[in-house]
UniProtKB/Swiss-Prot annotation:
The record marks R423 as: Interacts with the biphosphorylated intermediate. The lineage of its organism: Bacteria, Pseudomonadati, Pseudomonadota, Gammaproteobacteria, Pseudomonadales. It comes from Pseudomonas syringae pv. tomato (strain ATCC BAA-871 / DC3000). Binds 1 Mg(2+) ion per subunit. This is Phosphomannomutase/phosphoglucomutase. The active site is at S110. The phosphomannomutase activity produces a precursor for alginate polymerization. The alginate layer causes a mucoid phenotype and provides a protective barrier against host immune defenses and antibiotics. Also involved in core-LPS biosynthesis due to its phosphoglucomutase activity. Essential for biofilm production. Substrate binds at E327, S329, H331. The gene is algC.
Amino acid sequence: MNSPASVAPILPDTIFRAYDIRGVVEDTLNAETAYWIGRAIGSESLAQNEPNVSVGRDGRLSGPELVQQLIQGLHDSGCHVSDVGLVPTPALYYAANVLAGKTGVMLTGSHNPKDYNGFKIVIAGDTLANEQIQALHERIKTNNLTSQKGSITQVNILDRYFKQIKDDIVMARKLKVVVDCGNGAAGVIAPQLIEALGCEVISLFAEVDGNFPNHHPDPGKLENLQDLIAKVKETGADLGLAFDGDGDRVGVVTNAGNVVYPDRLLMLFALDVLKRNPGADIIFDVKCTRRLTPLISEHGGRPVMWKTGHSLIKKEMKKSGALLAGEMSGHIFFKERWFGFDDGIYSAARLLEILSQEPANAEDLFETFPNDISTPEINIKVTDVTKFSIIEALEKDAQWGDAKLTTIDGVRVDYPKGWGLVRASNTTPVLVLRFEAETQAELERIQGVFHAELKKVAPDLDLPF
């Protein structure tokens, strides 16, 4: 393989983002970019005394070419690369926990459109975010890069990952499960693993295909769950599971075909973990239901609200020693019995274990948890500059009335019977809003307050409520 030029080209600022590096292939990201990113990651890892790096890729069409250059860049910086091949992201995180090195790079476009690709990066056990990602860009710009000969070894991590989950999960009875991999990377393991746990599996779209010919692999959007819902109803299954493109998130559908939102899934997991670990910290992001806090407290846990973003949640988990965390986006992180990284496949297995021990079906079980009326996530298009200035203005000047304010990530306003949130997305030029309340009238009242305060600081905003 020919190494590119000795000095890096200028790389676009836009690809170096809050939780990862991501861009459009052949526009802002190409094989040369991947090489230099490999050089930067390798140099940073070596600076932290970690010469061993695991590398994986998802099923995107650009994957084979980009991963080859990424690995070459790591090799040329002097790192010893374990190439684990086409795997879901959690299997790469697993490799970075159980192989010699604690550095791992996953080449994945996650749930972005098919022409995207990107890099999720762990260096010496720490998932990179914000200024750490900017520092990689800085290394490339200033040519602060090591140059030595490393090595490359092919490693089969999937069998080991498969076995460890299979050995950890104990099923009390057989369940019938529909598994929709959306032609993403989870297809190489999820249906086989769930079958090995003792379930009857009805598999949808398990063939890895970066064209995503059936539906987009993003279970966070209702339109992508329609095939799963229909199949669950048609087959009388106990549960439906949908994985995102790289398998670090899972979507859940009950036997009645109703979607279980991730914050409600976290309620079930929290109760399960707290049974064995009274007093444990449970972390959730600012987008989650207000019903989580009292539920965790009542069952002897310590609820911790934190910023949105898989990298930021993992850092906070490490700091606090929390045993479980979850995000409204569907990332669930188990430290109890697992490694503390977000893993849609392991989370699905834990859900099956709990369900197999319950006499109630999934629909009835989730019905027992408190529920409010809530909106889906509302995205308001702004610019990458104004999204932050609007939030700053709200923090400074807004009048919210009698409420509890949380400003760790945007502005969350909790009233006695409901709440609203507005925050700047870290990944796109939008404001993210969400509302929840006991009654429709209270929901509309809270939306009215947000509408008025947003219009005060940004009169031109086009608000759908």
